[in-house]
Every structure is written in structure tokens, then in C-alpha cells.
Swiss-Prot record:
Its EC number is 2.1.2.9. This is Methionyl-tRNA formyltransferase. One of its GO terms (molecular function) is methionyl-tRNA formyltransferase activity. It catalyses: L-methionyl-tRNA(fMet) + (6R)-10-formyltetrahydrofolate = N-formyl-L-methionyl-tRNA(fMet) + (6S)-5,6,7,8-tetrahydrofolate + H(+). The gene is fmt.
Length: 315
């Protein structure tokens, strides 16, 4: 293509690999790929390459895996590639200002939210957690702040009542490459129109933790149902019964008022396990005891009915 750009790609997980794959079929020239060092994974803790590294090596691209880009010799790896632009997607390393300034057109990032909403580490999960009606991707010019750069392009998608973080991740992994290719075309032909973020609209997407995913029955049923979808597939909402963690895969909200204390089991039938919350009733539909597969409430009641006796309270 006549407006082909020399591109350095920096990314690590599958989400990033999907963007690299789109670049490789776009007519641009990917001159080098930066990704995180191989990490131990699986039961055997064998060193495993990132999805981005696997794809890059399949395509015969030069791969670089520095632990940090702060050392001068690692920054020189970037400089020696003489790139027009560096594309960063879920890379996992901080880019020092010296690196941000190296490419002719700077560095651009694909972020999984409609900035300035949900800057930070967990934008997909927080959009579900908060009950947002839509989310999307933002392609932005990177600066030294955390997701603070000027916005170059946005694509939105609705959030449905059935979406989990896993399903939303897949939707944004389709949108992101579309937005990236459009943005690169605009950068190449000089039509990109950077837009500053409105600081008054900023929200921060804090990292998730397993402790946050423990079900707090004092919250409303609506909030808990959103948490269950937001924390799926990680870290998974959970409750503790007889000292065992039980993951919750699916639940629904029953708006009926109840005078029972939060955590009180109201009913346990094949239609679900109904539990009082701070507001409304949460109907547990699919659960996973430790060491078992996920199962319907009915199947769990067949083997563990003593866990869910109406009138008892869950911790």
C-alpha cells in the first residue's frame, strides 16, 4: 500500500495477538514485536511464550522480550527499528518518555473502554460492574500518564444483560482491530484529529482481586448479579460454605422485597437458590464447588441440599 507505515507492535495476551494479526493483513510493515518474557504456566510451571510471541514467530517477525524498557540498551532496540509508529495493546510494561518520543508518529494504544471513562487496569470488568449501557475501544496517542493521552478514534458497542467479561472481551477484540486500522490510515494520510480527554468525566478501573469477588450479601441483588458477570472468567464471584469456596457462575435478580437479613436462604428449589440481599433477592442458578465442575442449582441441591436449608444464613 502506498501509505504503508513501519510499525513496532508491543503486546502480550490473546487480545493483543488479534490486533497484531489484523496489522499483518493490513498492508503495513511490522518491523519488530515486543512482548513480555516467557512465564511459567500450567501445573508443570513450564515456561510458556505469550500469544503475541507465538504469532510473531509463526510469521517470522523479529521478537524482543525485555524485562523493562528503562535500560538504555533496551531503548536502543526500539530506536534501531526506525519505526513510523509503535502500536501498544495490553503490553504490560511502562514505556518511558524516551521510547514514546522515538517513532515519527509517536506511540498509540488500544484501550478497552470509551475514554475518559475507565482508565486503568480493568476497564472491561468495571463497565459491567457499574452497570454501564455501553462500552467500546479507544485508540489514543500515548503520553507518560496512565491512559491520559489524546483520543484518536472510538468505537462503541452495547452491553447486554447476558454479557460477561469474557463475552465483552471477545466483542472488543473484534472492534479494536477495526479501530486500529482506521486510525493508522488517518495517521498515514494526515487526517487524524486528536481530541483531549475531559478530566471531569474520568473514572478509574481498579484492578480486581479474589477478595473483592467474595459475595457481600449486604449489596443489592442487582449489584451482585452484575459482579457475577463482571468477575467471569476471573476471579469469579464466590461464597464460602462449610469452609469451602463455591464459585457462582450465573444468577438472576428477583425484585421482591424481603424482611430477612442479608445472606438468609429463602428457598432452594429446581428454579434456583434464593438468597436475601441488601435490596431484593439473588437467585443462584449455576454454582461450582471446589474440585467440581459448574452445575445447575438443582444438581447441586441433589448432592448438597444440607448447604441450602431455608432460614440458614450464608456468610
Amino acid at each position: 500500500m502506498s501509505d504503508s507505515l513501519r510499525i513496532i507492535f508491543a503486546g502480550t495476551p490473546d487480545f493483543a495477538a488479534r490486533h497484531l494479526d489484523a496489522l499483518l493483513t493490513s498492508g503495513h510493515n511490522v518491523v519488530g514485536v515486543f512482548t513480555q518474557p516467557d512465564r511459567p504456566a500450567g501445573r508443570g510451571k513450564k515456561l510458556m511464550p505469550s500469544p503475541v510471541k507465538v504469532l510473531a514467530e509463526e510469521k517470522g517477525l523479529p521478537v524482543f522480550q525485555p524485562v523493562s524498557l528503562r535500560p538504555q540498551e533496551n531503548q536502543q532496540l526500539v530506536a534501531d527499528l526506525h519505526a513510523d509508529v509503535m502500536v501498544v495493546v495490553a503490553y504490560g510494561l511502562i514505556l518511558p518518555k524516551a521510547v514514546l518520543d522515538m517513532p515519527r508518529l509517536g506511540c498509540i494504544n488500544v484501550h478497552g473502554s470509551l475514554l475518559p471513562r475507565w482508565r486503568g487496569a480493568a476497564p472491561i470488568q468495571r463497565s459491567l460492574w457499574a452497570g454501564d449501557a455501553e462500552t467500546g475501544v479507544t485508540i489514543m496517542q500515548m503520553d507518560v500518564g496512565l491512559d491520559t493521552g489524546d483520543m484518536l478514534y472510538k468505537l462503541a458497542c452495547p452491553i447486554t444483560a447476558e454479557d460477561t467479561s469474557g463475552s465483552l472481551y471477545n466483542k472488543l477484540a473484534e472492534l479494536g482491530p477495526q479501530g486500529l486500522i482506521t486510525t493508522l490510515k488517518q495517521l498515514a494520510d494526515g487526517t487524524a484529529a486528536p481530541e483531549a480527554q475531559n478530566e471531569a468525566l474520568v473514572t478509574h478501573a481498579e484492578k480486581l482481586s479474589k477478595e473483592e469477588a467474595r459475595i457481600d450479601w449486604s449489596l443489592s441483588a442487582a449489584q451482585l448479579e452484575r459482579c457475577i458477570r463482571a468477575f467471569n472468567p476471573w476471579p469469579m464471584s464466590w461464597l464460602e460454605i462449610d469452609g469451602q469456596p463455591v464459585k457462582v457462575w450465573q444468577a438472576s435478580v428477583i425484585e421482591d422485597a424481603t424482611q430477612s437479613l442479608p445472606g438468609t436462604i429463602l428457598a432452594a428449589t429446581k428454579q434456583g437458590i434464593q438468597v436475601a440481599t441488601g435490596k431484593g433477592i439473588l437467585n443462584l442458578l449455576s454454582l461450582q464447588p471446589a474440585g467440581k465442575k459448574a452445575m445447575s442449582a438443582q444438581d447441586l441441591l441433589n448432592s448438597r441440599r444440607e448447604w441450602f436449608i431455608p432460614g440458614n444464613r450464608l456468610a
